[in-house]
Amino acid sequence: MAKTSRRRFLAGSLAAAAGALSRPSPAPGEPPRTQAPAAPRFALGLASYTFREFDLDTTMAMARRVALGRIALKDMHLPLESSDAAIRAVIAKVKAQGLVPYGCGVVYMASESEVERAFAYARTAGFEIIIGVPDHALLGSAERRVRETGIRLAIHNHGPGDERYPTPASILERIDGFDPRVGVCLDVGHAQRAGLDPAAEAVRCGARLLDAHMKDVTAATAEGGPVEAGRGVIDIPGFLGTLVRLGYAGTLSFEYEKDGKDPLAGLAESVGYVRGVLAAMARGGSR
């Protein structure tokens, strides 16, 4: 896109966000709206899957270019079968670049040994959280490992066509009564593709919302594809406002899946859009 049209697009998007976040007088019977919006408690991060076509050094350099200081590593950047020494070396390398390697994922677990491997890997790396997809029959084993290690498990929804966890509700119903450190990684794109409102899904998850993947999609159907944040159909200002009101204190990681061989421009636009919406919220108040 030409610079002029990109600037116009972003200016228009941020103006719309500011308008959406303005505070009309409450209707009769509505509680008064907060005059000073709460500051976001969540941090922005990067799902390294965004740079799946690139090595770790390039991925770290790109994370720094868009000023995303927290990173969740996918196994192409830190293989699950790595030795303890290799894991520690990679983590030291990431930290030396000023990045916080807060988690890993998405990690699939289809056997008891894969559950054991995932948690051993995360413990060696010092990860706070695993973004994972354990088979249904392994949820009990995964919860036991959460209790033993203190590492949180955020189960990722993958939208229409996923037989395990298509929606956040499909996760929540299976972990009801589990340790509170077992929860959901809310992928807003896949939620929207399932015809769901990501903001409502965040509310549904409540305290079980442990991680979130930020993206946008072209349609609220199974056919919806990835697109730069702000260009698709997701109500991103509404979603961000909901995270703020919920007091969500985890990481909102960008998982930009478009343009796999050249993702930086689209990622940068997406990060800029989200930061612009957050700035508009801070200036204009909450919805």
Residue ranges with predicted function:
Residues 2-43, 53-66, 123, 168, ...:
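Histidine-acidic metal/acid-base catalytic patches
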Residues 47-51, 74-78, 106-109, 135, ...:
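Active-site beta-loop-alpha junctions enriched in small/polar residues
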Residues 72-89:
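Glycine-rich, proline-tolerant flexible connector loops at the mouths of alpha/beta enzymes
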Residues 80, 139, 221:
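Short glycine-rich, flexible loops that bind phosphorylated cofactors or substrates
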